[in-house]
UniProtKB/Swiss-Prot annotation:
Cited PANTHER family: ENGB-TYPE G DOMAIN-CONTAINING PROTEIN, MSS1/TRME-RELATED GTP-BINDING PROTEIN
Protein's name according to its UniProt entry: Probable GTP-binding protein EngB
Residue ranges the record marks as coiled coil: none
InterPro entries: G_ENGB_dom, GTP-bd, GTP-bd_ribosome_bio_YsxC, P-loop_NTPase
Species this chain originates from: Leptospira biflexa serovar Patoc (strain Patoc 1 / ATCC 23582 / Paris)
Keyword tags: Cell cycle, Cell division, GTP-binding, Magnesium, Metal-binding, Nucleotide-binding, Septation
Lineage start: Bacteria, Pseudomonadati, Spirochaetota, Spirochaetia, Leptospirales
Length: 213
């Protein structure tokens, strides 16, 4: 049993800035950061809102590929949440897709204080090979990759078992275990465990008294 309930308080979080290119980041990467990437409509915005307990923090769009900027949110205790552009949506041109993938690659190569890369994937979809490659790249760069299977509440028990089996197979394929969370932003399932994981990984769990629910 976790020492915190699912309502474990998370640091107060506010929108900080957006950048279109990595050369605009200046000293944004001088503080600890966690980043969220995933295909369009993977549930990134909903997750950020649930994680921060701030419904309007990240705007949820029904239009695939709406997020094309790197959006940075900063917590009261000084670490960044970085929302990376969605990718892989069908309406994007080949050039747009390539540009976004280059942006993601450049981010992994240049963001100095990146501690965790969260890779989101809708539980109703198969886990793409491209994401496995991203996990391997992150590991090579000493960045902790963490997979989040979102919208887990949309599946019945059989479907959830299939997703877990799929992730076990993915770990076997690359030969290295990685952390996986099964999350529902709408019901709150897994949110408390995710908050706890973030605070412990960043070494700020002792500052719980300074955060707000």
């Amino acid at each position: 049993m976790h020492k915190y309930s699912k309502e474990i308080p998370f640091p107060e979080t506010k929108f900080f800035t957006s950048i279109a290119k990595l050369d605009e980041k200046e000293d944004l990467d001088s503080v600890q950061s966690i980043a969220f990437m995933g295909r369009s409509n993977s549930g990134k915005s909903s997750l950020l809102n649930a994680l921060s307990n701030h419904r309007g923090l990240a705007k949820v769009s029904r239009t695939p590929g709406k997020t094309k900027l790197i959006n940075i949110f900063r917590t009261k205790v000084g670490f960044n949440l970085v929302d990376l552009p969605g990718f892989g949506y069908s309406k994007a041109s080949h050039k747009e897709h390539k540009d976004m993938m280059n942006l993601l690659e450049g981010f992994l190569n240049s963001w100095k204080q990146l501690k965790i890369l969260f890779i989101l994937c809708d539980s109703q979809r198969d886990f793409p090979e491209e994401e496995l490659s991203t996990i391997e790249v992150a590991m090579e760069k000493k960045i902790k990759p963490v997979v989040i299977r979102t919208k887990i509440d949309k599946l019945n028990q059989s479907g959830q078992h299939k997703v877990r089996t799929e992730m076990e197979a993915a770990m076997n394929e690359i030969g290295i275990p990685f952390r996986v969370f099964y999350i529902s932003a709408s019901t709150g399932r897994g949110i408390g465990e995710l908050r706890e994981f973030i605070l412990e990984t960043l070494g700020i769990q002792t500052k719980v008294s300074n955060v707000e629910p």
